[in-house]
Protein backbone atom coordinates (compact mmCIF):
# COMPACT_ATOMS: atom_id res chain seq x y z
CA UNK A 1 0.00 0.00 0.00
CA UNK A 2 1.39 3.35 -0.97
CA UNK A 3 2.04 6.01 1.65
CA UNK A 4 -0.01 9.19 1.27
CA UNK A 5 1.63 12.47 2.02
CA UNK A 6 -0.09 15.20 3.98
CA UNK A 7 -1.09 17.11 0.84
CA UNK A 8 -2.79 14.08 -0.74
CA UNK A 9 -5.21 13.44 2.13
CA UNK A 10 -8.72 14.47 1.20
CA UNK A 11 -11.74 14.56 3.47
CA UNK A 12 -15.33 13.90 2.45
CA UNK A 13 -16.39 16.64 4.84
CA UNK A 14 -13.94 19.36 5.84
CA UNK A 15 -12.72 19.11 9.44
CA UNK A 16 -14.59 21.44 11.74
CA UNK A 17 -12.61 24.31 13.16
CA UNK A 18 -13.87 25.85 16.37
CA UNK A 19 -14.02 29.61 16.11
CA UNK A 20 -14.05 31.44 19.42
CA UNK A 21 -16.44 34.31 19.80
CA UNK A 22 -14.66 37.55 20.54
CA UNK A 23 -15.32 38.73 24.06
CA UNK A 24 -16.34 42.33 24.43
CA UNK A 25 -16.87 44.71 27.29
CA UNK A 26 -20.63 45.07 27.65
CA UNK A 27 -20.17 48.37 29.49
CA UNK A 28 -18.22 50.02 26.67
CA UNK A 29 -20.58 48.64 24.06
CA UNK A 30 -23.74 49.95 25.74
CA UNK A 31 -22.17 53.16 27.09
CA UNK A 32 -22.59 52.43 30.80
CA UNK A 33 -20.39 54.71 32.90
CA UNK A 34 -21.57 53.98 36.44
CA UNK A 35 -22.09 50.54 37.99
CA UNK A 36 -24.78 50.79 40.65
CA UNK A 37 -23.86 48.87 43.80
CA UNK A 38 -27.49 49.05 44.97
CA UNK A 39 -28.64 46.70 42.18
CA UNK A 40 -27.82 43.17 43.42
CA UNK A 41 -29.59 41.39 40.53
CA UNK A 42 -27.25 43.04 38.02
CA UNK A 43 -24.18 42.34 40.16
CA UNK A 44 -25.11 38.64 40.48
CA UNK A 45 -24.28 38.23 36.78
CA UNK A 46 -20.63 38.73 37.70
CA UNK A 47 -20.60 36.26 40.62
CA UNK A 48 -20.32 32.49 40.59
CA UNK A 49 -22.44 30.08 42.67
CA UNK A 50 -20.18 30.54 45.67
CA UNK A 51 -20.44 34.32 45.58
CA UNK A 52 -16.94 34.94 44.20
CA UNK A 53 -16.31 37.60 41.56
CA UNK A 54 -15.80 36.07 38.11
CA UNK A 55 -12.49 36.90 36.38
CA UNK A 56 -12.15 39.11 33.30
CA UNK A 57 -11.22 36.21 31.05
CA UNK A 58 -14.66 34.70 31.63
CA UNK A 59 -16.84 37.83 31.67
CA UNK A 60 -14.94 39.68 28.93
CA UNK A 61 -15.04 43.05 30.69
CA UNK A 62 -12.22 45.54 30.41
CA UNK A 63 -9.80 46.15 33.27
CA UNK A 64 -11.37 49.51 34.12
CA UNK A 65 -14.87 48.09 34.49
CA UNK A 66 -13.68 44.91 36.20
CA UNK A 67 -12.25 47.11 38.96
CA UNK A 68 -15.53 49.01 39.17
CA UNK A 69 -17.49 45.74 39.38
CA UNK A 70 -15.24 44.52 42.18
CA UNK A 71 -15.71 47.77 44.06
CA UNK A 72 -19.50 47.68 43.58
CA UNK A 73 -19.71 44.05 44.75
CA UNK A 74 -17.65 44.82 47.84
CA UNK A 75 -19.87 47.80 48.67
CA UNK A 76 -23.01 45.69 48.20
CA UNK A 77 -21.57 43.00 50.47
CA UNK A 78 -20.78 45.58 53.12
CA UNK A 79 -24.39 46.84 53.03
CA UNK A 80 -25.69 43.22 53.18
CA UNK A 81 -27.24 43.42 49.71
CA UNK A 82 -25.04 40.50 48.60
CA UNK A 83 -23.71 37.65 50.75
CA UNK A 84 -19.97 37.25 51.30
CA UNK A 85 -20.12 33.46 50.88
CA UNK A 86 -22.96 31.18 49.90
CA UNK A 87 -23.83 27.78 48.47
CA UNK A 88 -25.71 27.72 45.17
CA UNK A 89 -26.46 31.42 44.86
CA UNK A 90 -27.94 31.22 41.36
From Swiss-Prot:
Biological processes per GO annotation? translation
Cite a single Pfam family from the UniProt record: Ribosomal_S18
Tell me which InterPro entries the record gives. Ribosomal_bS18, Ribosomal_bS18_CS, Ribosomal_bS18_sf
Keywords recorded for this protein, A-Z? Ribonucleoprotein, Ribosomal protein, RNA-binding, rRNA-binding
Question: What's one GO MF term for it?
Answer: structural constituent of ribosome
Which SUPFAM superfamilies does this one have? Ribosomal protein S18
**Which cellular component terms (GO) are annotated to the entry?**
cytosolic small ribosomal subunit
What HAMAP family does UniProt report for this protein, alphabetically? Answer: Ribosomal_bS18
Assembly information from the UniProt record: Part of the 30S ribosomal subunit. Forms a tight heterodimer with protein bS6.
Family from the record: Belongs to the bacterial ribosomal protein bS18 family.
Function description:
Binds as a heterodimer with protein bS6 to the central domain of the 16S rRNA, where it helps stabilize the platform of the 30S subunit.
> Under which name does UniProt file this protein?
Small ribosomal subunit protein bS18
What broad taxonomic lineage does this protein's source fall under?
A: Bacteria, Pseudomonadati, Bacteroidota, Bacteroidia, Bacteroidales
Q: Point out the gene that encodes the protein.
A: rpsR
Amino acid sequence: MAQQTQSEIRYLTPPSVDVKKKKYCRFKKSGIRYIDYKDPEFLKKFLNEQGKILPRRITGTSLKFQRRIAQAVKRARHLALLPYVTDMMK
